[in-house]
Amino acid sequence: MVGLKPPEVPPTTAVKLLGAGTAACFADLLTFPLDTAKVRLQIQGENQAARSAQYRGVLGTILTMVRNEGPRSPYNGLVAGLQRQMSFASIRIGLYDSVKQLYTPKGSDHSSITTRILAGCTTGAMAVTCAQPTDVVKVRFQASIHAGPRSNRKYSGTMDAYRTIAREEGVRGLWKGILPNITRNAIVNCAEMVTYDVIKEKVLDYHLLTDNLPCHFVSAFGAGFCATVVASPVDVVKTRYMNSPPGQYQNPLDCMLKMVTQEGPTAFYKGFTPSFLRLGSWNVVMFVSYEQLKRALMKVQMLRESPF
């Protein structure tokens, strides 16, 4: 490592974990209203309260929420969302390279597509297992409809939501929907990480761009699009099942079958536009920030370790 420039120094696992969590939080701050709009569109038609809102399109959903529930409503669940990213993104993104190296055969300096997919599935599943309670609380806040600042709220705050869910639904309620969420995030993580990894690798191999902002932007945009196309059906089932009151669905499969019979197969792509807008922009902000944060953190680490 001596003599290498900061961008060339391989980042440590700690740097990757911190950088991934911080970059994901920054991306969430910028794109959270799109995620909330996606949740509202995904559950629309599921019950009378959601049906009466008549959400139409991304911008229409956000404007309806602001008009009926106040300007802060698109950011309902942000605290839980940031808690989720610090635990969730740190693992699924920060540990991806380490797990990929673990699965790569000894003596090989190149990871196959299969190895990358396995790494993406592994870190995605690990992240969901740790961060599921934060995701449940985030979805509950995003899906809750308030007529105004004085309307009855089921949860007084984020910590109250954790306590209330655990008290009323048991500790298992905090891990509600974990199986569809593991499926969804294994798929999303593969689509995001593998697509980003491959596009970036090919762009650099063919000298189309240097390892800098334009390369990171192109790779991240492609990753966001692929992730949205592949993961939307599972994402809708996950959102509905996690937000449902006890007894509405027996299990995720029952939720899926009821969606097909009551709303048709197009229900699985409800909220696709905000999903793409959100995942596309989220990936661009996150990956670009992540790459820059890794370099900045390595510079700081090298300065601290330097004897001069």
From Swiss-Prot:
Coiled coil (UniProt feature): none
Job description of the protein: Putative transmembrane transporter that plays a role in mitochondrial metabolism via an as yet unclear mechanism. Originally, this mitochondrial protein was thought to act as a proton transmembrane transporter from the mitochondrial intermembrane space into the matrix, causing proton leaks through the inner mitochondrial membrane, thereby uncoupling mitochondrial membrane potential generation from ATP synthesis.
Topology of the protein relative to the lipid bilayer: Multi-pass membrane protein
InterPro entries referenced in this protein's UniProt entry, alphabetically: Mit_carrier (IPR002067), Mito_Metabolite_Transporter (IPR050391), Mitochondrial_sb/sol_carrier (IPR018108), Mt_carrier_dom_sf (IPR023395)
Cellular localization per UniProt: Mitochondrion inner membrane
Protein name as it appears in the record: Putative mitochondrial transporter UCP3
Keyword list, A-Z: Membrane, Mitochondrion, Mitochondrion inner membrane, Repeat, Transmembrane, Transmembrane helix, Transport
Keyword Membrane: yes
Renumbered ranges of Solcar repeats: 11-102, 111-202, 211-296
GO function term, MF aspect, one: oxidative phosphorylation uncoupler activity
Recorded family membership: Belongs to the mitochondrial carrier (TC 2.A.29) family.
Mitochondrial intermembrane-facing ranges: 1-10, 97-116, 197-213, 291-308
Region Purine nucleotide binding: start-end pairs: 275-297
Transmembrane segments: 11-32, 74-96, 117-133, 180-196, 214-233, 268-290
Superkingdom in the source lineage: Eukaryota
Predominant place of localization: mitochondrion
Oligomer and partners: Interacts with HAX1; the interaction is direct and calcium-dependent.
Segments in the Mitochondrial matrix topological domain: 33-73, 134-179, 234-267
Species per Swiss-Prot/TrEMBL record: Sus scrofa
GO cellular component: mitochondrial inner membrane
GO biological process: adaptive thermogenesis; mitochondrial transmembrane transport; response to cold
